A protein has these predicted regions:
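Short, acidic/polar
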Residues: 241-245
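Short, well-ordered beta-strand segments enriched in hydrophobic/aromatic residues
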Residues: 37, 45-49, 83-91
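A low-complexity, Ser/Thr/Gly/Pro-enriched, surface-exposed linker/loop concept
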Residues: 40-79
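Bacterial Sec-dependent N-terminal signal peptides
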Residues: 1-24
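Catalytic and substrate-binding clefts that recognize carbohydrates or anionic sugar/phosphate headgroups
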Residues: 77-227, 236-238
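Hydrophobic faces of well-ordered beta-strands that scaffold small-molecule active sites
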Residues: 231-233
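Short N-terminal segments immediately surrounding and downstream of signal-peptide cleavage
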Residues: 23-36
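Short solvent-exposed loop/turn micro-motifs enriched in small/polar/acidic residues
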Residues: 30-31, 68, 75-77, 154-156
Length: 245
């Protein structure tokens, strides 16, 4: 009886694992001697330019995943332009035109999606901002001290740009980011080849910021958070305590 229960449990576990598993693929939509385009999701593309023809498959500090779920897309590569279309956007690149520029690459929304048109060099206007290195000396948004290197006394806190924007799209340039060396015993960081290559990520999400974060984790990896109860009770204040306190 016990053996049957154990066998049934193992079979059930295997079924659950197979149901939860998802086929992952490289999703390379197009590649030639110098450019490679990967469809990470219907709203996220990876765009690579390699002048020496050597594309990067190593993990980077930004992108730790190189395999992705299946995505529906259409590829047109006849003629002078390469065109990749998903349910959210359309990318066009002029064949054999070299490094990505505003003259040979454009990404725009498809009909019915949140409207945008992006070319290399276009800047966001509605970034929702991120975080800052330190709040030392800050009273609300104003710096009150003179010894903090990041801000001067009286200056307002200037948050760094974050991932999301009201523009409905985000652009990430990982061309200079460090790579992992794929050592099976002890992975370590290594520099990218200084060959003038480009390694970009473009995300189109409209105002669906939750979906944008989900798409980001497809290539950047999930960010596990420890449970709140593990931290116990924390309380502190910035200014010094007096001996009476």
């Amino acid at each position: 009886m016990m053996k049957k229960l154990i066998l049934a449990f193992c079979m059930l576990q295997g079924i659950l694992l197979s149901l939860g598993a998802q086929d992952m693929h490289q999703n390379i939509a197009y590649a030639d001697n110098n450019v490679r385009f990967t469809v990470i999701s219907d709203g996220t593309l990876r765009l690579e330019y390699a002048p020496d023809g050597k594309f990067v498959d190593n993990k980077s500090f930004v992108a730790v995943n190189r395999l992705y779920p299946d995505v529906d897309y259409k590829l047109k590569s006849k003629g002078a332009w390469i065109e990749i279309t998903t349910s959210k956007m359309r990318m066009r690149y002029k064949k054999d035109s070299g490094q990505f520029t505003g003259n040979n690459l454009v990404i725009e929304a498809v009909k019915g999606a949140f409207p945008f048109t992006w070319k290399p060099g276009v800047q966001q206007k509605g970034n929702l901002k991120g975080t800052y290195r330190t709040l030392d000396g800050m009273d609300g948004e104003t710096q009150t001290q003179t010894w903090v290197a990041d801000t001067k006394k009286g200056e307002q806190l200037k948050l760094e740009d974050g991932l999301l924007a009201t523009d409905g799209w985000s652009f990430i340039d990982d061309s200079q980011g460090l790579l992992f060396d794929n050592d099976p015993d002890w992975e370590w960081a290594k520099e990218r080849p200084a060959n003038g290559g480009q390694d970009w990520y473009f995300m189109a999400y409209g105002h669906d910021y939750k979906q944008a974060l989900k798409d980001y984790t497809l290539f950047a990896g999930k960010m596990p958070l420890p449970p709140r109860y593990a931290f116990g009770y924390w309380w502190s204040r910035y200014w010094l305590y007096s001996d009476k306190e």
